[in-house]
Amino acid sequence: MLEKFVDSLWKFCRKSKFQYMTPVADAVDSFCFEPLHTPSSPPFVRDAVDVKRWMMLVVIALMPTVFVAIWNSGLQALVYQSSDPQIMEAFLHISGFTSYFSFVSKEIGIASVLFAGCKIFLPLLFISYAVGGTCEVLFAIIRKHKIAEGLLVTGMLYPLILPPTIPYWMAALGIAFGVVIGKELFGGTGMNILNPALTGRAFLFFTFPAKMSGDVWVGSNPSKIKESLAMMNSLAERSNFDGFSQSTCLQILNSTPPSVKRVHIDAIASNILKLEHVPSQEVLQSQFSTWAESFPGLTVDQLSLDQLQNFVTSPTAEGGLGLLPAHFDAAYSLTDAIYGIGKFSTGNLFFGNIVGSLGETSTVACLLGAGLLLLTGIASWRTMLSFGLSSLFFAWLFKIISILAAGQSGAWAPAKFFIPVYRHLFIGGLAFGLVFMATDPVTSPATKLAKWFYGAFIGFLTILIRLINPAYPEGVMLAILLGNVFAPSFDRIALKQYRQRRV
């Protein structure tokens, strides 16, 4: 039956009046069956894995992130829009898989979570394929060439890097820009120098920044989520710094001013977690001893919230830590991110029980996809490894430099440099970009040595933007796009090295 439909489509397109539709018939035939065409120029390689199957393997590798996107976006939306502080409290204090699924089944419902997630993700996926496919077809008809299979992957990647609240017309505009400007302008699939999905996201980020950052990470209606959070905070009598919010770890890291130092974070952590020792313990205890002269019997781990705020914001000459009162909220939030408190626990970050772009929240889902891509040889392990190691190294290097520059074990160094190095792999889109974006064989270098340079360059830029640039909370997107631009240069350097070795 399918074969008859394809045959009838070919007959229809072979009529003189509709010959311009031949690329459409060829695309449908290639999608349903084995491609009809063979290479017209060398190299000629006989292999069962053609471009279509290669693309489908990438789509299969993306399935774990797609499932997490549906599940997590649905769960976060239902919890955040519940207006019930008890549900939110229970959700934030989940520990372990047993309590997690017990909470979902009792408080929310598995079917409800999946239905809510599908309502958020599937329309964006449909828009991505429909609009992107239309652009591909139009260019194929105009240029009279075959429709390539590249959109199979681009159409899946694009919605996974969007916030769930993105308006549909913006999503359509972004994928159109990515396909037309990022790919077709350079000649189509295999000719583009920029990743089309990231190009579309970059266009939206710089054109509509308010819709791509801020409070855009939960549900599909930001206004409803804000009202629900305000009601929950009111009912739970929570203040600004300990209230429920949809801030991501990267947002907190980026928005924290340099005036928030390591000693401020350690003081707050000592009080919340009842820690007996923190990295800046010597400075902290010295200041506290002076401040506590007016409050005999107090210890830093037994302060009330008001006393803690008073200690942290009092002038250093009086034994306080000298933080501006207006920055106490930021310091309190950053403490959660650095010490893994509440929703920013290592387990939540690794498995994806956090808010963020649809497909970028779960590191474990990205690693499952990486396993398939590496097993099939589609992705370069050199790019992945150099990207990951470079990110870890430069995050560690910034930390060491800040300690050496500030002295006193880094007690007075900016606190944002002290987020645990490994956490950079779990937050934002680093894991997703490392696995699925940086390894794009079209926009990444072709030589082995160049792949090492390329991955290291992207890792360095990612951490540099995250920790130094105050304008952008996430550096992965810009780092990979810049890496795409410099990829030919890395290949040129690598080839030059090869020639020198042979001589």
UniProtKB/Swiss-Prot annotation:
Chain positions with FMN phosphoryl threonine modification: T248
One Pfam short name: NQR2_RnfD_RnfE
GO biological process, one term: respiratory electron transport chain
EC identifiers of the protein: 7.2.1.1
Catalytic activity line of the entry: a ubiquinone + n Na(+)(in) + NADH + H(+) = a ubiquinol + n Na(+)(out) + NAD(+)
Source taxon at top rank: Bacteria
Main EC class the enzyme belongs to: translocase
One CC-aspect GO term: plasma membrane
MF terms in GO: FMN binding; oxidoreductase activity, acting on NAD(P)H, quinone or similar compound as acceptor
Alphabetized UniProt keyword annotations: Cell inner membrane, Cell membrane, Flavoprotein, FMN, Ion transport, Membrane, NAD, Phosphoprotein, Sodium, Sodium transport, Translocase, Transmembrane, Transmembrane helix, Transport, Ubiquinone
Required cofactor names: FMN
Membrane topology category: Multi-pass membrane protein
InterPro entries on file: NqrB, NqrB/RnfD
Subcellular location(s) per record: Cell inner membrane
Function, in words: NQR complex catalyzes the reduction of ubiquinone-1 to ubiquinol by two successive reactions, coupled with the transport of Na(+) ions from the cytoplasm to the periplasm. NqrA to NqrE are probably involved in the second step, the conversion of ubisemiquinone to ubiquinol.
Quaternary assembly: Composed of six subunits; NqrA, NqrB, NqrC, NqrD, NqrE and NqrF.
Family the entry assigns: Belongs to the NqrB/RnfD family.
Protein name: Na(+)-translocating NADH-quinone reductase subunit B
